[in-house]
């Protein structure tokens, strides 16, 4: 039987994603009530970090432990994936030792090669192309605050990066409309836009932040230059019109939420009054990485 990988939102059915989402919402409530279960007792998760991250490491480590399992941290320098040993061979060996593998890496092809050869589930904790765990946390956060996300409109303003790619895939899988405003030359990859549109998603891409956020239910942004993507930096003057500030938020819906995956560069992509304001749910997002990923782990390992 093939392992249940969590590689991208496009690679998991809408029904399975909804199962994971509903489990995450229920699992968080149970955890808060002190009635959470430990369905992954005796299981071991290998965590490979070729790109560092505080939130990802802590949330997966704590999440696995809350489910009764254990974790093994492996840094990029320790692993030397594809250098000292092929990625395929590493995947086969790790599969003999652990029950699941989480990887945060650079090229998306490295994730896919690992999953191709692994005989245990592989989870995408981030690549340069996508960040599906973050979007599961974002959708969970939206639904906690505003109810079902289906039929709602989400706006993105800023760089066409990996978080946006997964947000676009989420539009097809969860049924929300997606508006995007990015500078010329910073558009998301056509592959993700075309896939989502072919799946029936309502996608609007423009270069005008005011147009993208008009009347929307949620405004999302991220850093203007992602980690290890400094070669794409184009200067703050290019991105300044896409800053999320009070004036831009005023053009969104009256009860629109503001989201950011963090860490944020305050005063750049978002102003203090927005990220610290009443519409901001950024720390709920960060918290929900823990609970969303617990349900992803449980789904991959057959516990839901």
Curated annotation (Swiss-Prot):
Gene3D superfamilies hit by this protein: Aspartate/ornithine carbamoyltransferase
Q: Reaction catalysed?
A: carbamoyl phosphate + L-ornithine = L-citrulline + phosphate + H(+)
Q: Which GO terms describe its cellular component?
A: cytoplasm
- The EC number(s) given in the record are 2.1.3.3
The GO biological-process annotations, alphabetized, read as: arginine biosynthetic process via ornithine; citrulline biosynthetic process; L-arginine biosynthetic process
Quick check: keyword rRNA processing in the entry? no
Q: Which PROSITE patterns match?
A: CARBAMOYLTRANSFERASE
Which biological pathway?
A: Amino-acid biosynthesis; L-arginine biosynthesis; L-arginine from L-ornithine and carbamoyl phosphate: step 1/3
For whether the record's keyword set contains Amino-acid biosynthesis, the answer is yes
Q: Which UniProt keywords apply?
A: Amino-acid biosynthesis, Arginine biosynthesis, Cytoplasm, Transferase
* A GO term for molecular function: amino acid binding
Which InterPro entries does UniProt cross-reference here? Asp/Orn_carbamoyltranf_P-bd (IPR006132), Asp/Orn_carbamoylTrfase (IPR006130), Asp/Orn_carbamoylTrfase_sf (IPR036901), Asp_carbamoyltransf_Asp/Orn-bd (IPR006131), Orn/put_carbamltrans (IPR002292), OTCase_ArgI (IPR024904)
Q: Which Pfam families would you find in this protein's record?
A: OTCace, OTCace_N
Q: Tell me where it resides.
A: Cytoplasm
Major subcellular site: cytoplasm
List ligand-binding residues for carbamoyl phosphate.
Answer: 53-56, 80, 104, 131-134, 261-262, 289
Which residues are recorded as binding L-ornithine?
A: 162, 222, 226-227
Which HAMAP family has this protein been placed in?
OTCase (MF_01109)
Task: Tell me, in a sentence or two, what this protein's role is.
Answer: Reversibly catalyzes the transfer of the carbamoyl group from carbamoyl phosphate (CP) to the N(epsilon) atom of ornithine (ORN) to produce L-citrulline.
What NCBIfam families does the record tag this protein with? Answer: orni_carb_tr, PRK00779.1
Q: What is this protein called?
A: Ornithine carbamoyltransferase
Name the source organism: Rhizobium johnstonii (strain DSM 114642 / LMG 32736 / 3841)
| Taxonomy of the source species | Bacteria, Pseudomonadati, Pseudomonadota, Alphaproteobacteria, Hyphomicrobiales
